Amino acid sequence: MHPCRRSLPFPLNCQLVKVGTADYGGASDQSDQQLDCALDLMRRLPPQQIEKNLSDLIDLVPSLCEDLLSSVDQPLKIARDKVVGKDYLLCDYNRDGDSYRSPWSNKYDPPLEDGAMPSARLRKLEVEANNAFDQYRDLYFEGGVSSVYLWDLDHGFAGVILIKKAGDGSKKIKGCWDSIHVVEVQEKSSGRTAHYKLTSTVMLWLQTNKSGSGTMNLGGSLTRQMEKDETVSDCSPHIANIGRLVEDMENKIRSTLNEIYFGKTKDIVNGLRSVQTFADKSKQEALKNDLVEALKRKQQC
């Protein structure tokens, strides 16, 4: 692991702000171009190898360390809360130094006395959100692990909803779904409405290894954003509003992955490999052409 990874004080998804830097012209342009190329490369590499590829890129260009770590989402890792005996997910949003906070017990592991904590009001909301998304995960994914972390902002709060579902390798199929939903909530002065900004990233990979078709890897990541104003009331609290946004976003991303990415891959594979013999395929094409010609003649009459 690269030495700079443990020293970063900011989350992986936050944006770095450059203050008081001099304009070095060509050097700055070259650095920006290197970062663009590195990010473009990471988008095209398998999600299950993100950590290794990210480490290799940082070793090649150490000056991009902070920019890459703040821009590239990494697969979620699972830890066990020894206090309550439940699993939770690790990310930079529940990390303080080398310790990670569990959403279930609100304790850091390894123990940390002065670790960052949400306010009492937000902690209560965090507990309710974890219970709600635990049920959501069980209904939609039938397993896996989920975690929700919230933190205070000046005019509202922000949070991250994490969901991870890994395949068990049965039927010679391996895979993993990692979704990271970062939401920012700006509460209006009236207290009756709020502005929600959601940024969602899904990393998905599948690997099959069957004697009939051989080994096939398929994976990628997709990021989408949306903003929406919602009414806040007893009938429609923050958790319900955020839950609907996350549910709609995951359905859209899942549909996009299924129809575009997997559908396109299926078309490509079917174009390269066919279960039909060439003779049968030629007969089918000839029959289709005959039907088209017959319909044209019928329309002309």
UniProtKB/Swiss-Prot annotation:
Swiss-Prot/TrEMBL GO biological process terms: actin polymerization or depolymerization; barbed-end actin filament capping; cell morphogenesis; cytoskeleton organization; lamellipodium assembly; negative regulation of filopodium assembly; regulation of cell morphogenesis; regulation of lamellipodium assembly
SUPFAM superfamilies on file: Subunits of heterodimeric actin filament capping protein Capz
Tissues expressing this chain: The isoform beta-3 is predominantly expressed in the testis. It is only detected in total sperm, sperm heads and the calyx fraction, but not in sperm tails or any supernatant fraction. Weaker expression also found in brain.
Location in the cell: Cytoplasm, Cytoskeleton; Cytoplasm, Cytoskeleton, Perinuclear theca, Calyx
Keywords from the named record: Acetylation, Actin capping, Actin-binding, Cytoplasm, Cytoskeleton, Phosphoprotein
A cellular component annotation (GO) from this entry: brush border
Annotated signal peptide: none
Annotated positions of the N6-acetyllysine modification: K264
An example Gene Ontology molecular-function term: actin binding
InterPro entries, A to Z: CapZ_alpha/beta, CapZ_alpha/beta_2, CAPZB, CAPZB_N, F-actin_capping_bsu_CS
Pfam families on file: F_actin_cap_B
PTM-bearing positions, type Phosphoserine: S31
Predominant location category: cytoplasm
Family stated for the protein in its record: Belongs to the F-actin-capping protein beta subunit family.
Primary role: F-actin-capping proteins bind in a Ca(2+)-independent manner to the fast growing ends of actin filaments (barbed end) thereby blocking the exchange of subunits at these ends. Unlike other capping proteins (such as gelsolin and severin), these proteins do not sever actin filaments. Plays a role in the regulation of cell morphology and cytoskeletal organization. Forms, with CAPZB, the barbed end of the fast growing ends of actin filaments in the dynactin complex and stabilizes dynactin structure.
Subunit structure: Component of the F-actin capping complex, composed of a heterodimer of an alpha and a beta subunit. Subunit of dynactin, a multiprotein complex part of a tripartite complex with dynein and a adapter, such as BICDL1, BICD2 or HOOK3. The dynactin complex is built around ACTR1A/ACTB filament and consists of an actin-related filament composed of a shoulder domain, a pointed end and a barbed end. Its length is defined by its flexible shoulder domain. The soulder is composed of 2 DCTN1 subunits, 4 DCTN2 and 2 DCTN3.
Protein name: F-actin-capping protein subunit beta
Species name: Bos taurus
Taxonomic classification: Eukaryota, Metazoa, Chordata, Craniata, Vertebrata
Name of the gene: CAPZB
